[in-house]
Amino acid sequence: MELREINKLCDDLGAKIIKINEYKERGLIPNSGSPYLINEPEVFFTVISVGTAQAKAPEAEKFIARKMGWTKISPSLNKGDFKTPENNYIELKNSFSNKAGCLNLRQIRLWQEVDYYLCVYIDETNIDNSVVLLLTHEQMEEEVAICGSATHGTAAANANNQNIEYSITIKIGSPMMAQWIEKYNAPDIRNQIIGG
């Protein structure tokens, strides 16, 4: 990493801290409790943007589930992450602004009895550029066959493995992303979790 990149990171972090302090002064951030209880999407995603990827993902999951009215389910059910009020099972895949500028879908478990995959890319520099996609289980199977790869292990190591976890990486702004948006864009869900 060069000093130029470090300086940019410091500037970005400084701008986020200023914005967070402004939100606090306006009473948009509670003094205690979990960040996912914040109501305004832009405020929530700005607050968690200063955390690590490992810290952001679970908070974002809780926020999205609360906004959608979904219930967290036990991983032992092998039916994804959440159950909807309509009794559908959802696997949520979220990713945030990153150096590569990609939507990273990791640990796609096609053997699970999931009805839908909700794939969310949060652009932390401009929330309006965020992407929300909804795929059926069958659509995800098709996409994994086209552009997926095993998350762990080699082809030889996975030859006899029936439960292979897959990954898909899509560059934001690429022709592939444009195709996914055309096929799987979920504007109603996007409005609920990110706003219009």
Residue spans of the language-model regions?
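Nucleic-acid endonuclease domains
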Residues: 1-196
